[in-house]
């Protein structure tokens, strides 16, 4: 996962990788994670590397989120920090997610096929609000943009992101969870209109 973070940073022109840990307390598991991260970082001199204890990371994400670029951590801390990040940008309704493997799908033919991946909205299916027209589809749409990037359809991904940002700028087309007046379909229609 640490190598992936650096490769992701390089591929997406990111300038810094922050490794988040609790090695001061969890000396064996997190200590190994930290030591491994420091060794791997030496292979990427073009990318700034820092390590940070998880509680300090949570505070700094709230105070100065712009100081972070790529964060790599273990699952437990990742779950917590990703929900914190979602809260900073408007809630789980706007947060995309991806699970990306390190090899192509078993049925893929060409060696250049992208790694097997799954993209989803962080909030899951939200069955409690299904059919009510109050769901915010932003997270799912941004996950779709990530999927498009993943399969090298970057122009389509950029168009989708532009459409989403356009719809989010007005209370008339923003969903209620973000202080807007639009329902799910109205927001979706606004995104589509902005993409034309």
Annotate the PLM regions:
Residues 38-42, 165, 196:
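Class I S-adenosyl-L-methionine
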Residues 30, 137-141, 184:
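Short alpha-helical patches at coil-to-helix transitions and adjacent helical residues
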């Amino acid at each position: 996962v640490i190598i992936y973070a650096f490769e992701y940073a390089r591929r997406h022109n990111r300038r810094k990788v922050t490794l988040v840990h609790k090695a001061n307390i969890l000396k064996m598991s997190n200590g190994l994670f930290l030591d491994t991260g420091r060794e791997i970082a030496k292979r990427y001199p073009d990318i700034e590397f820092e390590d940070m204890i998880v509680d300090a990371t949570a505070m700094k994400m709230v105070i100065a989120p712009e100081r972070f670029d790529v964060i790599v951590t273990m699952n437990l801390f990742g779950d917590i920090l990703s929900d914190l990040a979602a809260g900073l940008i408007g809630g789980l309704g706007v947060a995309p997610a991806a699970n990306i493997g390190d090899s192509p799908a078993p049925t893929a033919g060409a060696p250049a096929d992208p790694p097997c991946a799954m993209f989803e909205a962080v909030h899951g299916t939200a069955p409690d609000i299904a059919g009510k027209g109050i769901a915010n589809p932003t997270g799912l749409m941004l996950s779709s943009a990530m999927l498009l990037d993943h399969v090298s359809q970057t122009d389509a991904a950029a168009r989708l992101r532009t459409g989403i940002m356009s719809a989010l700028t007005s209370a008339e087309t923003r969903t209620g969870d973000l202080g807007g007046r639009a329902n799910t379909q109205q927001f979706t229609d606004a995104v589509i209109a902005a993409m034309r």
